[in-house]
């Protein structure tokens, strides 16, 4: 994602010319407004109010398409030839910050929040949800209940989705006059795509 004509666009870097171009295949497009297929908008900044809606976060590539999250909560798909841009589904609720991460497998996207409830003193439920990439199906595939916890570092290998559970507590550093988060990874888990079941793979701190 880069700045082009005073807004942000999905860009392609040409290794031969060493230049960037908007990923837009529209005929006669001027690449300077929201009608452009490469249009992203203004990336979110904590220090200013903006009217856009794309997160300053990861760009995902899966099966010849590029995916981004926007601050309206949508997963948005861009074709790599610039011919289309489409909103697939609302996959999370945006509240000013987002730890939302994605893992793609078998035409589904698995969505989790790596911030979760880290540092909270009350018990809460962390989830992994999946959405079909045609936007027609949504379901919660995993729930973890814990205190001050979050699901993190999810990776897809073979027929399993592996992830860690991170827990954190907050403490006050009186000398530095600041609050410190103390976190650790607790056990490795795996979700089986075929059976829909999950369990611990490795016990204890990692």
Residues of each region from the PLM?
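Repeated scaffold domains used in trafficking and secretory/extracellular systems
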Residues: 1, 32-60, 94-106, 146-158, ...
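Short beta-strand elements that form the blades of beta-propeller/WD-repeat-like
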Residues: 1-10, 52-70, 103, 107-119, ...
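Repeated polar recognition positions within modular binding domains
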Residues: 6-8, 71-73, 98-100, 124, ...
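Surface-exposed loop/turn elements that mediate protein-protein interactions on large endomembrane-trafficking
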Residues: 9-37, 73-93, 119-145, 171-204
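N-terminal hydrophobic targeting segments
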Residues: 111-118, 125-129, 139-152, 157, ...
